[in-house]
């Protein structure tokens, strides 16, 4: 494995059962194969992976106000919804961070980890495009050049619209079968950051 991709990191967001229900599965049936492909490519080529997951306490002490009011939240500890989708499980040594917010970058650990492991370009994939992926991508783009793997994201509503809204902030979109070509193209953004 070379260090050609040493400046890149793939961030997988909320690839958990609660965020891939039957309706989303029907609308995005290729998501599992696409995520498997991009994860395998990154692991083979030496692009580090960070896993970001939602996790909330049963006692509601860390629930966002919107959910406290509605008395319901996905990804409660011990629930079915918190389970990691089989195609997105971490390998030993791949960091996993847990969040109680839409935006992974509201956790100080997220940016600190990316800086600590000397990454200069963030590639984002995950669920749900219009919420957690959207918020994390916006925040990431303020700190690092950021790309998004469009066929490794899904949202029951507003998927394409969310991606279009992010176009102004990202270095570009990629797909699971073109990620290396696009990472090469994005290298200029690392040099200029």
Residue ranges and their predicted role:
Residues 1-9, 37-40, 44-45, 71-193:
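Active-site-adjacent betaalpha module
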Residues 6, 24-55:
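A short alpha/beta connector and helix-capping loop motif
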Residues 9-15:
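Acidic-leg catalytic submotif of subtilisin-like serine proteases
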Residues 15, 54, 151:
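Active-site loop/turn elements of alpha/beta-hydrolase fold enzymes
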Residues 16-21:
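Short acidic, Gly/Ser-rich segments with clustered Asp/Glu that frequently serve as metal-coordination loops
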Residues 23-29, 68-74:
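Short glycine-enriched, charge-decorated loop/helix-capping segments at active-site entrances
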Residues 46-49, 53-71:
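Early exported N-terminus immediately downstream of N-terminal targeting peptides
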């Amino acid at each position: 494995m070379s260090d050609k991709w040493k400046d890149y990191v793939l961030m997988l967001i909320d690839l958990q059962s609660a965020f891939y229900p039957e309706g989303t599965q029907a609308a995005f049936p290729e998501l599992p194969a696409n995520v498997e492909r991009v994860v395998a490519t990154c692991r083979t080529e030496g692009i580090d992976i960070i896993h970001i997951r939602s996790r909330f306490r049963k006692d509601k002490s860390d629930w966002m106000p919107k959910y406290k009011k509605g008395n319901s939240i996905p990804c409660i500890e011990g629930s079915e919804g918190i389970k990691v989708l089989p195609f997105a499980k971490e390998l030993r040594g791949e960091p996993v961070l847990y969040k109680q917010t839409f935006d992974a970058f509201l956790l100080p650990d997220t940016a600190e980890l990316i800086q600590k492991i000397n990454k200069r370009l963030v590639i984002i994939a995950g669920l749900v495009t219009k919420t957690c992926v959207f918020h994390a991508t916006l925040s990431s783009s303020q700190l690092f050049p950021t790309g998004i793997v469009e066929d490794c994201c899904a949202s029951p509503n507003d998927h394409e619209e969310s991606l279009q809204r992010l176009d102004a902030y990202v270095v570009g979109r990629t797909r699971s079968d073109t990620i290396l070509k696009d990472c090469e193209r994005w290298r200029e953004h690392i040099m200029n950051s």
